[in-house]
Amino acid sequence: MEDFEMMSAAARERGLKIIMDFVPNHSSEEHDWFVASEAREEPFTDYYIWRDRNESNPGGLPNNWLSVFRGSAWEWSETRGQFYYHAFTKEQPDLNYRNPAIRQEMIHILNFWIDKGVDGFRMDAVPFLFEDPSLRDEPVSGKTDDPEDYNYLSHIYTWNFPEVKTILAELTEFVHVKTGGSGVVMLGQS
């Protein structure tokens, strides 16, 4: 933090603005939240997307959803005895935005960095914030014959759900109110 504060002060002296990368979709599997969620410790139990085995699917996978980086988007946790969802790598479990506590956590994170003097945020992986709560299988796209390739499926249940706009509006409104509309910028990946 000391390094960041020194860099921030040096940037201000030069009239530069600081925009941080903000990835609200997932955390590391080593993050305290995930470790506690995996152990079913409250209030973190539902901070991530956990599902039981579905014995009607190969490998017991909850459904056919694919990771952006190939293969199933589900990883088995021996500790919890359930699968967790990851749109990207298994080391990056997706946060559960259907849990209101996650929304509050994101506001706390933005608040922390605004208080540290950040001038804006570039939000990454935004279209991946919500998934179909019914876990419906995604349809085959016809774009490739490789069933491990992300493009094998049409991502109608894991990408750009209408609720994404609601979350973006909530976060943007928080930043606007917090800063009095002073020009802290929010950029989102589309």
Region annotations inferred by a language model:
Residues 1-111, 115, 128-190:
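Acidic/aromatic-lined carbohydrate-recognition and catalytic surfaces
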